[in-house]
Amino acid sequence: MDAHALDNLMERMVADYVVHNQAASVLKAMLDETGVGFAPVIDHVTIRTLNIDQGAEPFVSLGYAYDETLQYDDWYAKVYRKPGYPSLFVDQAYPDERGKTSIIPGWVHKFGDKVFHHVAVRVENIEQAVVRLKENGVVFAGNIVGERGGHLRQIFSSPEMVDGQPFTVLELAERHRGYLGFLPPQADSLMKSSTGK
């Protein structure tokens, strides 16, 4: 596996995402100012696609491995992992009747499947992070999901709008007790908060 090629792919896609997401740009500037940078705090990245296996292929060919499948009412996701890199969350609508109500196909037709829908950054104190980012003009969609003291707490920024359509969001993720997974009810709630409605 070529780590240099994977680094280049991840750097290019994250840079493209940050350019098109105001919340991520604000956070990156804050982190760059301290010398931390954006890349070291990335928890996971998410691609929306019409075919999960094809969407994940560029990452799988560079060493990512399938870990788990998460299922929801009208969409599902596969999680891929590679030690030393952010988790990769790839989602799509079900290809049958169940997927008819999913927002994913419309998003993919508008924006493609070679861009990140969102990047999640790891935070130590999600409430404090929300307050500081709000002070710098970031708007959040909905409320923090997940119980205080629970394994995983998350929130999405309000989506960047392109031609009236929600494009990308920034996710803040607070994790505890070594938990690296995803909680389906929370992920579905976040998905719904990313519609811009």
Regions found by a protein language model. Give the residues of each.
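Amphipathic alpha-helical segments
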Residues: 50-66, 128-137
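Vicinal oxygen chelate
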Residues: 1-36, 40-50, 70-91, 104-197
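The feature marks the first
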Residues: 24-53, 62-65
